[in-house]
Amino acid sequence: YGADYDDGELNKHHTGGKHEYLISGSAIHCDVYINLPKLKTHKKAGITVNLKNLVGVNGDKNWLPHHTVGTPADGGDQFPDRTWKTWLEHTGAQTLRKTALALPGVGTWLLKRARKAGKRAFGDGNRTVRSGNWHGNDTTWRMCLDLNKIVLYGRPDGTFRPAELSAAKPYLCFVDGVLGGQGNGPMDPDPLESRCILFGANPAAVDAAAAVVLGYDIEKIPIVRQAFQATGFPIAAEDWSRIQLTSNEPRWNGALGNLTGSPAMLTTKPHFGWVGHIEATAWHNHKG
């Protein structure tokens, strides 16, 4: 499911093993790609840093899959569990969306009114998991890593660079965490005064460092974990736990595997759909 109540456009581009994206020419034509994200939590991805920030190179948000209809038991990730309430919410929403498409103006007005009533009946989106806004989202990370591969390896003529990290486009990451966001990110976060700036030359490596600094477990964040496992067109070169973090703050120096779960890292609040899942314990205990 994409960004609009008409899912026809999205499903036309993502079907039968085909995945198409509409990408800004500037991102492909540039000699060096520079990414300048804020450091925030994210309802669909856990965190939004460099890898998630590449949604910005897209030219039409309705080409981007955000979640898959249903529950994990149905092969979806819209809701965690299949209940009569989630069934009723999904069925009612689908009916209203079709009405909005069939009756422009009237249908759209009805949909807006129904959303207000639905909030009372099914719960506020800032407290109730829906639309893939939880740690079981298995769609958004895939879309984001596709975009990263396109920017790293895509050529203006539609072909790709050799599938070797050494051939990827030069890339610089500067993460603004001076005032970031925690809790219900990305749109309604609480301020996070981490007062840090992270930088590096690989988006997955910098995102891994950001996750550890935030006090989270990389193995529980698919968008970061899977970036280190990407095949075909690699995004990262090594095991994330061996990446060295170098900081002017001595307690933050060391391999990410050793720093994960350290009390020296920040203690931050995840999005409510990720609370109790994403937080790190000491990495050596986690591995054991």
Each language-model region and where it sits:
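Extended, low-polarity segments enriched in aliphatic/aromatic residues
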Residues: Y1-G288
